Amino acid sequence: MTQRTVWQDFQNGQQYMATWPMRKELAAIFPEQRYIKATKFATRVMPAVAVMSVLSQMAFNNYGALPQAMTVALFALTMPLQGLWWLGKRSRTTLPPSLAIWYREIYEKITSEGHAMQPLKKQPRYLELAEVLNRAFKQLDKTSLERWF
C-alpha cells in the first residue's frame, strides 16, 4: 500500500463522513454513525490527551516515563486517523446484493418523484448509498420513506 492510497483513504473518509446522513433510522442498520461520532470525538479530544500525557510526565520530572508517554501520545494522535481510514475504506466498498437492491429502489423512488440524480451505478458503493440516502431524507416526505424505515 502506497502513501498515496492511504492519503486517499483519509480524504475519502472525510468525504464519506460529510455525506453520510446522521439519522436515527440508520443507526441500527449501519455502523457508520458510531464510527463518525467516535472519529469526530477523537479529532477534538485526542490531541489534548497526547499533549497531557507528555506534559504530565515532564511536569512531575518523571523523564524515565517519557518514552511510554510518547507512545501513548502517538497512539492518541492516530485514533482519528484510524476512524478516517476505516470510513475511507468503507466508502469504496461495493454494496452487498441486498443493499444494492435497496439502493436501486430508493434511487428509483427519488427519480420517479422528479428529482435529478447522478446516473445509476451498476456496482454501487457505500458512498453512493450515502448520497442516495442523503437525498432521500432531504427530498422525500415521510410517507415515501416508510417502506424502508
Swiss-Prot record:
UniProt keyword annotations, A-Z: Cell inner membrane, Cell membrane, Membrane, Transmembrane, Transmembrane helix
TM stretches of this protein: 41-60, 65-87
Q: Which GO terms describe its cellular component?
A: plasma membrane
* Chief localisation class: membrane
InterPro entries with a match to the protein in the record: UPF0208
Asked if the keyword Membrane belongs to this entry, the reply reads: yes
Family, according to the entry, reads as follows:
Belongs to the UPF0208 family.
The name this protein goes by in its record: UPF0208 membrane protein PBPRA2797
Q: Which organism was this protein described from?
A: Photobacterium profundum (strain SS9)
